[in-house]
Curated annotation (Swiss-Prot):
Belongs to the bacterial ribosomal protein bL9 family. Binds to the 23S rRNA. InterPro entries: Ribosomal_bL9, Ribosomal_bL9/RNase_H1_N, Ribosomal_bL9_bac/chp, Ribosomal_bL9_C, Ribosomal_bL9_C_sf, Ribosomal_bL9_N, Ribosomal_bL9_N_sf. It comes from Methylobacterium radiotolerans (strain ATCC 27329 / DSM 1819 / JCM 2831 / NBRC 15690 / NCIMB 10815 / 0-1). Keywords: Ribonucleoprotein, Ribosomal protein, RNA-binding, rRNA-binding. GO terms for cellular component: ribonucleoprotein complex; ribosome. SUPFAM superfamilies: L9 N-domain-like, Ribosomal protein L9 C-domain. This is Large ribosomal subunit protein bL9. The gene is rplI.
Length: 190
């Protein structure tokens, strides 16, 4: 199905281009979200008549997105979640969670603007791309931790999932003596 793009669409084309796409993609995504028009003669004439207005509106949206991008780029946000000892979350962090935490900080973002290939399922610092406009993309850092104190430690670069190694000598035990005692106990039973 041929459509006329009303805005830049990643991996497809620029505003004003006529592209050939699958009918389902056109109906369910491009046409439904107002990103394209069917490429009929009437729509082509209508688009050319409205082109200047569409370009001006696109430029305004881009400028607004750039203002937000300046403030948002490089920001770090903390998400507190429960996890196991190995750092694997009991749930996951989705785009909805990201939109909620970023909105609480005063930014206007939609969950569809976050680009996650898969949900975040581990503790740690994660870099997440945010597409504010088809031509404006920034990255934020999401610090997923079990507590605010742990988030501070992660921000300093400390690992919170490693088990602390301990020395038996620090516990006041002689390794050889402990092994010998364990061996004697086995002889008494046998």
């Amino acid at each position: 199905m041929e459509v006329i793009l009303l805005e830049r669409v990643a991996k497809l084309g620029q505003m004003g281009e006529t592209v050939n796409v699958r009918p389902g993609f056109a109906r369910n995504f491009l046409l439904a979200r107002g990103k394209a028009l069917r490429a009929t003669e009437a729509n082509k004439k209508h688009f050319e008549a409205q082109r200047a207005q569409l370009e001006a509106r696109n430029l305004d949206r881009k400028k607004d997105a750039e203002v937000v991008a300046e403030k948002l780029n490089g920001q770090s946000f903390i998400l507190i979640r429960q996890s196991g000892e190995t750092g694997v979350l009991y749930g996951s962090v989705s785009t909805r969670d990201l939109a909620e935490v970023v909105s609480k900080e005063g930014f206007t973002v939609d969950r569809g603007q976050f680009t996650l290939n898969q949900p975040i399922k581990t503790l740690g610092l994660h870099t997440v791309p945010v597409v504010l406009h088809p031509e404006v993309e920034v990255e934020i850092t999401v610090n997923v931790a079990r507590s605010p104190e742990e988030a501070e430690r992660q921000a300093r670069g400390e690992s919170v999932t490693e088990r602390e190694a301990f020395n038996l000598d620090d516990l006041g035990l002689e390794v050889g003596q402990a092994l010998a005692d364990a061996g004697e106990g086995a002889d008494d039973r046998g």
